């Protein structure tokens, strides 16, 4: 139990520390703003340095002038927004059975069309040993692998929604009764339970097909899966391939996709300014700083974040310059390499990410920005579609209890003996202290 009286004694020290940090942040902000102005004057040379030299930190490449400020256009009256989010029940050896549950929230919101929305979730229980322990061959814990599989499921379901809502281009569309898995390389990546769920979802989603209107696919968080960098190549492929296949389907359906990051802590754009502050003629982190980039002389504004700087530069409804991320994992993304910009959505500065194919087509790019901004306005500071997808996906404490109660009933009906939780779990639930 938390002793608040003891915590209160530490509050004064915390408040004094935060006050000093706020003053220091203003100094860093002034330095960053000055470097931004200087870098704009030498932007072509700095971009060339970024492209030709190996740096010890991730610096995004600006593909527009650094002083770009663009007012985002109004969203069309008739449009559709789709979103997915996921949640799970973690596996535990202390429960009555070692299994886990993935729950993917699905949202389709139609505006100006007189159509009902889709708000539901698709649960899946993973219990077969070949699914539970497949990741152990790569030294990955089941609990960790479960999170990766949730990411895959979110992307696959988002692709299905985009195809069903907007239709697939290039003669690859499916009939109303057909399985959405065909021809996209997903079959080998899905468990048996996932196949049956996909077939059910195909029948449900067939009711959504109508004449197309501008449509946006939204996902919560980054499109850059940094965690993949540390995984063995076979595990990385098993996760990334179905995700990119789903993004291919969105591209063919001409449904732009964005990754929306609220309160982003990234400094990838600011790191480009470190090229300007580098005291050496040619940036070579290994040669001049022995690879120790955190304390390098070019790091003059840490720990300032991108959104802090752009909050001083953008007006509500404006976006900043477009950047191309330099994350190493993006070398595996092909035509889905990730770009991003910062958008003043009114309540905050959001980082909005796009696959390369969205940026390359102006209509898709403009649609993505205008519908994203509209979603934030409708959600009073956060995209309403993402908030609803989260609400559909979240597994609360009561849901967890009912899930295991249902599982216990089925195990007893199957004639299993000694069904129950471990003594440790039972003791934690029924404390008498």
Segments (PLM) and residue ranges:
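Long, contiguous domain-sized segments
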Residues: 1-65, 74, 79, 143-167, ...
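Short secondary-structure capping/turn segments at boundaries of alpha-helices and beta-strands
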Residues: 67-71, 87-89
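Short hydrophobic beta-strand that contains or immediately precedes a catalytic carboxylate
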Residues: 81-84
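Beta-hairpin (beta-strand-turn-beta-strand) motif
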Residues: 86-87, 222
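Acidic, metal-ligating active-site segments
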Residues: 89-140
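Alpha-helix boundary/interfacial micro-motifs
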Residues: 102-104, 185, 237-238, 278
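Short, basic, low-complexity termini and linkers enriched in Ser/Thr/Gly/Pro
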Residues: 166-210
